[in-house]
Amino acid sequence: MSSKPTPITPELVASHGLKPDEYQRILKLIGREPSLTELGIFSAMWNEHCSYKSSRLHLKGLPTKAPWVLQGPGENAGVIDIGDNEAIVFKMESHNHPSFIEPYQGAATGVGGILRDVFTMGARPIACLNALSFGAPEHPKTRHLVSGVVAGVGGYGNSFGVPTVGGQVRFDTRYDGNILVNAMAVGLADADKIFLAAASGVGMPIVYLGSKTGRDGIHGASMASAVFDDDSAEKRPTVQVGDPFAEKLLLEACLEIMAADCVIAIQDMGAAGLTSSAVEMGAKGNLGVDLDLDKVPTREPGMTAYEMMLSESQERMLMVLKPEKEREAEAIFKKWGLDFAIVGHTTPTLRFVVKHGGEVKADLPIKELGDEAPLYDRPHVETPKLPIIHARDIKPPIGVVEALEKLIGSPELCSRRWVWEQYDHVIGGNTVQRPGGDAAVVRIKDGPKGLALTVDVTPRYCEADPYEGGKQAVAEAYRNITAVGGKPLAITDNLNFGNPERPEIMGQLVGCLKGIAEACVALEAPIVSGNVSLYNETNGRGILPTPSIGGVGLLDDFTKSATLAFKAAGEAILLIGETRGWLGQSVYLRDICGREEGAPPPVNLDAEKRNGTVVRGMIHSGTATAVHDLSDGGLLIALAEMAIAGHIGAALDAGPEAIVPHAWWFGEDQARYLVTVPADELLGVLTKLKAVGVPCLQIGKTAGHTLSIAGERAIDIKALEHAHEAWLPNYMGGKA
């Protein structure tokens, strides 16, 4: 029986997130009014989340190639070669809007989705990281959101069985109505067994794998492409529900059918579910796709074609199967207790045809849905340059030691232990360096190789100067990987911005991308995967521009990794890199002086590369006993973190007369490291560094149980540690 078609009104088009000109483009493309299912398909494929229509033009400027890159952007995840027929597969992706509406499930399914992106490529996940941005601590929703998101990330990762080894947590009032949950997953695969999404061959069976389809997550991708308002909490039904135990079964079943050589192409059902997975597989392979929705396993009776095509139920995959392997593949999935259903086949027509109940519900051109979606060159204006702050013009309201006591326990700089202790960071037994250091270190199989992993960005720099902020995010990832002894190899990015229809916001995105591209070229770390999340604003107020950078580096021998903890008393403390006392956009200027202003510190990429190469050499030769990169909070914060980690104090010289004390100790100049070396090796190290033109200054030595600066009162390391560890648990317990 034929159902009565739904009239397509301007209101219905608008509710699907399509602009009037985009709807006119659809009419011209298909030569008729679309059905409701077709409108839903266009809405899913042409939204910002799936099509990158506002950013695609500018993403083309990113460097994506290197001899060690096996797969760059455009697939489920990026792939790099690390030798010995081993490949690392990794990507970072956002789940921002769902996590604000339903923090536990939003964060959990964000982790689940990124894990699927990695194992779809044939890799076994070995580590997760995340970058979490929350509103101001005093905002009434913040505590609830932190609690839910952290529980969701931990609950999914811990149950699935992958360690969560590092990340970032920040608080800022600009995220009050729009938190960010960026999840990164890293997997290990055989370099000659990488599985891609492009279908090949006509008449090949298309198989639905995994969990059943329900009504959860319908319009999830469209919601991720919209701005928020006061009624956004009503969108809770569009948040997907995750089952990490089903995902673990799906992982094992997928890796088993891959090993059995059953797979032509495979794609995870993520944003826009069955629609995007089927369209992407066909479009990438220059093939059409016919789907029969009567064959789709459903969780609820009476689901319409529209609902099935747009559902974002979790733990599902779509595969193009080698026909002769059907019985073997089905047996594997039945063994793991998962659905296996042939729901369609590839065609030579370049049409996307969807049938349900004996009727054709959609018949559309597949290329125009996929890689030929709309592309916008949106108007953008460059962010105005801010004046350079001169440190001598900033009068310190309190002394250096008082400032240290205040900053080390502040929301910006305090320990994140409360967060990472809720994650299982050692499951699998390969975590060499746990959270709390510059980068996580994960052993590969039984060694000797290891991976250095980090996630970095400084949003306040990106707003003040998007170009320098973009450069700094990459440079910070480079330094963090270097500080543990890793050689940075490649990057995944997660670009979180406000409304791209506002020229100043589009200008932030363009500026950050220019800086990121320049840094990636200079530091030889190409972008191999990524994600763009736009429209992160509530009631017209955008987030801070937050291009999260996920970095992956390689250690030839994980036993030679460095940590930030002081190791012994009597060692020389060296400051590597040039210090000018840059206070613009520093934590000190904001939190101690109450001023959010000035140009951020400039990033000299030549100095970053030169200094990083020297520090890695010191680690590999065994000269460096402790290493820490300098970032938020500057020199004195980094020294305090090293002292706290090692339970050893330091006797520090006063800073040079040319730089005022508060700028020397709290300036945030880039390309700097702190390194300790044994006293008997000091002269040799200083001579070598001078010969290669690397600025280096001995600023003190490790000693005792206090941090003491010449001319200032000493402060006990235990007191610093208490202040550093106290704020977050007190806040989450309602005491701060």
Swiss-Prot record:
Top-level enzyme category: ligase
Compartments in which it is found: Cytoplasm
Residue positions binding substrate: 94-97, 116, 240, 312-314, 533
CC per GO annotation: cytoplasm
Positions of the catalytic residues: 49, 95
Keywords: ATP-binding, Cytoplasm, Ligase, Magnesium, Metal-binding, Nucleotide-binding, Purine biosynthesis
Reaction(s) the record says it catalyses: N(2)-formyl-N(1)-(5-phospho-beta-D-ribosyl)glycinamide + L-glutamine + ATP + H2O = 2-formamido-N(1)-(5-O-phospho-beta-D-ribosyl)acetamidine + L-glutamate + ADP + phosphate + H(+)
GO MF entry, a single one: phosphoribosylformylglycinamidine synthase activity
Pathway: Purine metabolism; IMP biosynthesis via de novo pathway; 5-amino-1-(5-phospho-D-ribosyl)imidazole from N(2)-formyl-N(1)-(5-phospho-D-ribosyl)glycinamide: step 1/2
Residues at which Mg(2+) 1 binds: 93, 531
Residues holding ATP: 52, 91, 493, 530
Top-level taxon: Bacteria
Pfam families from the UniProt entry: AIRS (PF00586), AIRS_C (PF02769), FGAR-AT_linker (PF18072)
Residues engaged in binding Mg(2+) 2: 117, 268
EC number: 6.3.5.3
Described function: Part of the phosphoribosylformylglycinamidine synthase complex involved in the purines biosynthetic pathway. Catalyzes the ATP-dependent conversion of formylglycinamide ribonucleotide (FGAR) and glutamine to yield formylglycinamidine ribonucleotide (FGAM) and glutamate. The FGAM synthase complex is composed of three subunits. PurQ produces an ammonia molecule by converting glutamine to glutamate. PurL transfers the ammonia molecule to FGAR to form FGAM in an ATP-dependent manner.
Subunit structure: Monomer. Part of the FGAM synthase complex composed of 1 PurL, 1 PurQ and 2 PurS subunits.
Record-given protein name: Phosphoribosylformylglycinamidine synthase subunit PurL
Organism the protein comes from: Rhodopseudomonas palustris (strain BisB18)
Lineage: Bacteria, Pseudomonadati, Pseudomonadota, Alphaproteobacteria, Hyphomicrobiales
